[in-house]
């Protein structure tokens, strides 16, 4: 199944729309302490199978991690279990920091 790969600019544009998408951060806690996108829901990748029922099914979900690999795997899993509007932040929070918010720490 194909998952939409959104650039940081596309994600920024999506955040201005209604309904606003849910930003799902699947990084580890120590990574989240370094930086995160405002308003994100944090569920580490390894807990997604146990907690995906906490996610809304009536708004788009944009999944992100550090570079976009873990989040792509989570997005594929969410689509597999029935979520219909799931996308991946291409390049992860690293790309976001480089292209949208240069004040965000890089790691």
Task: Locate predicted features.
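Short, surface-exposed ligand- or partner-binding patches at beta-edge/loop junctions that are enriched
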Residues: 64
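Rhodanese-like catalytic fold shared by cysteine-dependent sulfurtransferases
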Residues: 1-22, 28-60, 69-107
């Amino acid at each position: 199944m194909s998952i939409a790969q959104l650039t940081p600019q596309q994600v920024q544009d999506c955040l201005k729309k209604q309904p606003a998408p849910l930003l799902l951060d699947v990084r580890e806690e120590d990574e989240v302490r370094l930086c995160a996108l405002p308003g994100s829901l944090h569920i580490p990748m390894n807990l997604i199978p146990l907690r995906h029922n906490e996610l809304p099914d009536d708004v788009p979900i944009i999944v992100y991690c550090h570079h976009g690999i873990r989040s792509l795997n989570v997005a594929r899993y969410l689509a597999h279990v029935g979520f219909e509007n799931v996308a991946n932040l291409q390049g992860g929070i690293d790309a976001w920091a480089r292209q949208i918010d240069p004040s965000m720490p890089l790691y």
